[in-house]
């Protein structure tokens, strides 16, 4: 197998060499549907809304070439390296004329498709323009009269927004195994706390918190505050002991589940996210929402949700890339978490900024520092070939770095 190496080839050069520029037309910005290769025909690659194995293979080759052409490989923001499903692209192309219309006529269908996919009534679903808005409106609805409780470090969107509003945020350090310290969080759950935030699997640590303990904590917390559970990485989990907390919503508890179209569905640029909650909670959140996904986000998300074959193939490729990284990190004798996401988190033994700089020189962008774990690295999972190249580069960069952990990182 030919080793993977990031290419200095520019996007413009790649478009020319790939024969994607015709009649003097030249692409600018990101690849648009009209410039993507036909991949033979939709009849071959998407059958009954499902991406075929042959279609995924062709799609994978095309996307890998485009990623190399774009410059440094993006392994910093936990994006899906395969982008949107061919079925989603087809849905957007078929609905292209809707781009001139206000609103998104396809939103009601998306709501129904999503409700069916998670097994709740339609009135338990709200669609918003990305997770950032979702977290903001939950904070406005349930965090303004008291404090916010969260583990730390975790996904920063909600805590950061709360602090910008002058809300007091109680940040509970992670446990020794870098999971949520639920015992301490429970002790900090005073009458002053109005909103409790849990990210599971957690970002940046990539791991899941014990299912039984988390359920017990959330059930208790929901009797004292609203609980927001961010399940952005739910679709990547392979740990059989893990389960979503959607069933707690079905039981009528004070729990809001946050999901996104940005990860396994590859729709980060189309800003689509999902709220799962009781109807009365949805009714309180809805007036605070200032926007909704555009027509293309709604069309693409609905098609992708139904394309379970594409999701399964993305998940399998993610497992392959994740195992490549876990093996490489273990061989270097580095401490790491048990990743259940599309990224890994491990002890590099040197400031992350140095690792970033060295990896960028080799053609890879990786994640930033997450205090207090400033010598731990977060690297998103790309294609298996990309991860083999990363695994080969890491020993040269961090091989001689200290393996012992600082007192704040034990």
PLM regions and their residue ranges:
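Conserved PLP-binding catalytic core of the aspartate aminotransferase-like
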Residues: 174-176, 319, 331-362
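Phosphate-binding glycine-rich loop
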Residues: 99, 109-147
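N-terminal secretory signal peptides
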Residues: 1-13
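Active-site pre-lysine segment of PLP-dependent enzymes
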Residues: 182-191, 207-227, 231-264
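PLP-dependent aminotransferase class I/II
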Residues: 254-337
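C-terminal segment of N-terminal export signals and the immediately downstream linker at the start
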Residues: 31-77, 83-94, 405-410
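PLP-dependent enzyme catalytic core of the Aspartate aminotransferase-like
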Residues: 361-362, 370-410
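Conserved PLP-anchoring active-site segment centered on the Schiff-base-forming lysine
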Residues: 141-161
């Amino acid at each position: 197998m030919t080793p993977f190496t990031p290419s200095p080839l520019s996007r413009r050069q790649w478009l020319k060499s790939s024969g994607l520029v015709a009649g003097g037309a030249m692409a600018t910005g990101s690849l648009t549907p009209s410039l993507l290769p036909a991949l033979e025909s939709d009849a071959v690659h998407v059958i009954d809304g499902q991406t075929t194995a042959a279609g995924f293979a062709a799609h994978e080759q095309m996307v890998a070439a485009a990623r190399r052409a774009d410059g440094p490989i993006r392994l910093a923001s936990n994006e899906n390296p395969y982008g949107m499903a061919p079925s989603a692209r087809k849905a957007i192309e078929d609905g292209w004329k809707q781009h001139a219309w206000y609103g998104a006529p396809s939103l009601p269908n998306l709501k129904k498709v999503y409700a069916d996919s998670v097994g709740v009534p339609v009135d338990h679903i709200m669609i918003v323009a990305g997770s950032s808005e979702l977290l903001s409106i939950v904070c406005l609805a349930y965090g303004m009269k008291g404090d916010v409780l969260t583990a730390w470090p975790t996904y920063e969107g909600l805590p950061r927004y709360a602090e910008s509003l002058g809300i007091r945020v109680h940040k509970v350090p992670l446990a020794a195994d870098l999971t949520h310290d639920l015992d301490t969080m429970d002790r900090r759950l005073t009458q002053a706390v109005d909103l409790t935030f849990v990210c599971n699997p957690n970002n940046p640590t990539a791991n899941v918190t014990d299912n039984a303990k988390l359920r017990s904590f959330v059930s208790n917390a929901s009797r004292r505050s609203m609980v927001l559970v961010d399940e952005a990485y739910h679709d990547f989990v392979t740990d059989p002991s893990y389960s979503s907390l959607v069933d707690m919503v079905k039981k009528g508890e004070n729990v809001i589940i946050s999901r996104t179209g940005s990860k396994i569905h590859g729709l980060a640029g189309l800003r689509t996210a999902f709220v799962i909650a009781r109807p009365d909670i949805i009714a309180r959140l809805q007036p605070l929402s200032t926007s909704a996904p555009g027509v293309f986000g709604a069309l693409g998300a609905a098609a992708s949700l139904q394309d379970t074959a594409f999701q399964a193939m993305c998940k399998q490729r993610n497992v392959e890339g994740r195992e490549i990284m876990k093996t490489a990190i273990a061989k270097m004798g580095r401490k790491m978490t048990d990743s259940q996401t599309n990224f890994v988190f491990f002890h590099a033994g040197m400031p992350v900024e140095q690792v970033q700089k060295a990896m960028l020189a080799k053609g890879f962008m990786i994640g930033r520092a997450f205090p207090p774990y400033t010598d731990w690295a977060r690297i998103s999972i790309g294609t298996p070939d990309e991860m083999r190249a990363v695994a080969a580069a890491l020993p040269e960069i961090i091989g001689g770095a200290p393996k012992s952990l600082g007192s704040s990182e034990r």
